[in-house]
A protein has these predicted regions:
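Cleavable N-terminal signal peptides of Sec/SRP-targeted secreted and luminal proteins
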Residues: 2-21
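Charged, compositionally biased non-catalytic regions
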Residues: 11, 35, 63-110
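Disulfide-bonded cysteine-rich modules in secreted/extracellular proteins
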Residues: 23-29
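Extracellular Cys-Trp
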Residues: 31-62, 67
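Structured beta-strand/turn binding interfaces of compact recognition modules in eukaryotic regulators
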Residues: 43, 93, 137, 146-150, ...
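A conserved cap/lid and substrate-binding interface adjacent to the catalytic center
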Residues: 99, 105-211, 229-237, 260-262, ...
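Serine hydrolase/lipase
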Residues: 141, 186-211, 225-372
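Gly/Ala-rich beta-loop-alpha elbow adjacent to hydrolase catalytic centers
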Residues: 212-216, 220
Length: 372
């Protein structure tokens, strides 16, 4: 009996594929995503309508597929190394609690960033702090939302223990690590969200650059998703670049983020330990457990600059490409603390000025002091 059913399915499958393809044969985005029978998706890379699961013929990743009419006007996002470097510097500024404006002035002088607010709050029972800031550049027509990474080894341990003992918390339509959500909400609800809303109201055409390193990148992910979900700014204006980001939430959160934030880039150094946290044993599970959102940009060994060898990771599993960072086994804290020759957590000690005389072991020293 079972063999008869299986044989019938095999015979019927090609016909079903043809029928499904028929409903996803529209020639424009609006008609494609408005299909009444199948959730077709439009790919701007080949300007064609595709059926769900058509991995072999659809050149777009999940993050690039368009399934909603409101996104048909979205431009196909591209990884921008120059913008990535700017975002990294802005992430490094977040570590400066005392003089962030001076760091902004020195790191990107021509942008003339104006600091709007800096928020620091205790984000766990051990008294560890989370921090973030909002700034604006009228020269670049950009609003910056940046979050600081962990500043002490005890905070990293608190995050690790929290991920093991505390269930994930609901966030929008998915679930995320409780520590990330708690830190984000304490900062966001204090004044960051209100400041962003005020700036967007005055400058509706400005892009919103959301960024962070390590713990800060997890909170930046939540911020970008929140901005898009609640329509605080047009989705096309929201840009996320993160550096050494841990897994923020589960598969549902990753899927929602990919659908909401089209211009999202998760920059990862080879051998960086933190993107492997929280741990995944075996193959990433789409039904339970932590799962990365897209799009990973993987820098190979000795990436001393933003233009070093790198590639966008479109392999399988989606967002957990087994040929990119998920394949790395020799993990390193130093590769986490240093991106593009910038010791992210301690760069503020130079007042965010690049110096040729910086010691080669500055990144390692940064880790020893807990600045990672």
């Amino acid at each position: 009996m079972f063999r008869h059913v299986l044989l019938g399915f095999v015979v019927f499958l090609p016909q079903l594929t043809v029928v499904v393809a028929f409903f996803c044969s529209d020639n424009n985005c609006e008609e494609c995503v408005n299909s009444h029978f199948i959730q077709c998706r439009w790919c701007k890379k080949d300007n064609k309508c595709h059926t769900p699961g058509a991995v072999a013929t659809n050149p777009c990743s999940r993050a690039e597929n368009i399934v909603e009419k409101s996104r048909c006007a979205d431009e196909l996002s591209r990884y921008d190394p120059e913008l990535s470097y700017k975002m990294l510097l802005l992430s490094a500024v977040a570590y400066d609690r005392l003089h962030p404006q001076e760091c902004l002035n020195n790191s990107l002088p021509s942008a003339r960033f104006q600091l709007q607010t800096v928020v620091t709050r205790k984000c766990d029972v051990f008294g560890n702090e989370c921090s973030g800031y909002v700034a604006v550049s009228h020269a670049l027509k950009a609003i910056v939302v940046a979050f600081r990474g962990s500043v002490k080894i005890w905070q990293v341990l608190a995050e690790f223990v929290d991920s093991l003992l505390t269930p994930e918390a609901t966030f929008l339509n998915g679930s995320v690590q409780t520590y990330w959500k708690r830190g984000f909400e304490k900062l966001w609800q204090s004044s960051m969200e209100a400041e962003v809303k005020a700036l967007v109201s005055k400058n509706p055409s400005y892009q919103i650059w959301v960024t962070g390193h390590s713990l800060g990148s997890a909170m930046a992910s939540l911020a970008s998703t929140w901005l898009a979900y609640y329509n605080i700014a047009p989705r096309k204006n929201i840009i996320l670049y993160t550096f050494g980001m841990p897994r923020v939430g589960n598969y549902k959160y990753a899927l929602q983020h990919d659908q909401l934030v089209n211009n999202s880039w998760r920059v990862v150094n080879d051998n960086d330990l933190i993107p492997h946290f929280p741990l995944v044993v075996g193959i990433p599970n789409v039904l339970a457990g932590p799962y990365h959102h897209g799009m990973e940009v993987f820098y190979s060994e000795n990436a001393v600059s933003v233009n070093s060898t790198h590639r966008e990771c479109h392999g399988k599993p989606y967002n957990e490409d087994a040929t990119c960072s998920f394949s790395e086994k020799r993990l390193s804290f130093e590769r986490h603390s240093n991106y593009f020759s910038i010791p992210v957590g301690s760069f503020y000690k130079t007042k965010c000025v690049r110096r040729s005389a910086l010691k080669k072991n500055e990144a390692t020293q940064s880790f020893k002091e807990g600045k990672w």
